[in-house]
Amino acid sequence: MAIEGLIKQGFVTMSLDRVINWARTGSLWPMTFGLACCAVEMMEAGSSRYDLDRFGIVFRPTPRQSDLMIVAGTLTNKMAPALRKVYDQMPEPKWVISMGSCANGGGYYHYSYAVIRGCDRIVPVDIYVPGCPPTAEALLYGIMQLQDKIRRTNTIART
């Protein structure tokens, strides 16, 4: 976080947008939506080797407590309404990471009658993590890209 100005006696001045975005990037609470083998790599990212807790990322069991949804795996026609319902239950601001080839565009099962060809047809996606399955490092990089995106957004509406 860059300092815009320093005043005497240790006071720092900066825009409220930057303070809010700094707080949001340091406390992402993802709600996991594991549908296939990509979910195993998502669980690996939460283990002690990669330790998402050091980034302030704490997995939440309910959508009402989370601001990030990680969709990992093949999204079928039967699961699409459940995905949308969970997304609608999340409070604003909310972000979505699409993890893996199946979540991004259908993957190996792209031409199947039962598969949605990308979860972005159901919910708006902010970050796409490629791979089949993507590694835990790729998910970590995607989360860092999301943090950069959050830092660049304006949170306070200007008229």
Curated annotation (Swiss-Prot):
Primary location group: membrane
Gene name per UniProt: nuoB
Protein name: NADH-quinone oxidoreductase subunit B
Cofactor note: Binds 1 [4Fe-4S] cluster.
Catalytic class of the enzyme: translocase
InterPro entries attached to this UniProt entry: NADH_UbQ_OxRdtase-like_20kDa, NADH_UQ_OxRdtase_20Kd_su
Gene Ontology terms: cellular component: plasma membrane; respiratory chain complex I
Assembly behavior: NDH-1 is composed of 14 different subunits. Subunits NuoB, C, D, E, F, and G constitute the peripheral sector of the complex.
Alphabetical list of Pfam families matching this protein: Oxidored_q6 (PF01058)
UniProt KW 4Fe-4S keyword: yes
GO biological process: aerobic respiration; electron transport coupled proton transport
Residues annotated as transmembrane: none
Translocase listed as a keyword: yes
EC number: 7.1.1.-
Subcellular compartments: Cell inner membrane
Species assigned in the record: Vesicomyosocius okutanii subsp. Calyptogena okutanii (strain HA)
Family designation: Belongs to the complex I 20 kDa subunit family.
Molecular functions (GO terms): 4 iron, 4 sulfur cluster binding; iron ion binding; NADH dehydrogenase (ubiquinone) activity; NADH:ubiquinone reductase (non-electrogenic) activity; quinone binding
Membrane topology per record: Peripheral membrane protein
UniProt cross-references to PROSITE patterns, sorted A to Z: COMPLEX1_20K (PS01150)
Record keywords: 4Fe-4S, Cell inner membrane, Cell membrane, Iron, Iron-sulfur, Membrane, Metal-binding, NAD, Quinone, Translocase, Transport, Ubiquinone
Enzymatic reactions: a quinone + NADH + 5 H(+)(in) = a quinol + NAD(+) + 4 H(+)(out)
Function of the protein: NDH-1 shuttles electrons from NADH, via FMN and iron-sulfur (Fe-S) centers, to quinones in the respiratory chain. Couples the redox reaction to proton translocation (for every two electrons transferred, four hydrogen ions are translocated across the cytoplasmic membrane), and thus conserves the redox energy in a proton gradient.
Cofactor or coenzyme needed: [4Fe-4S] cluster
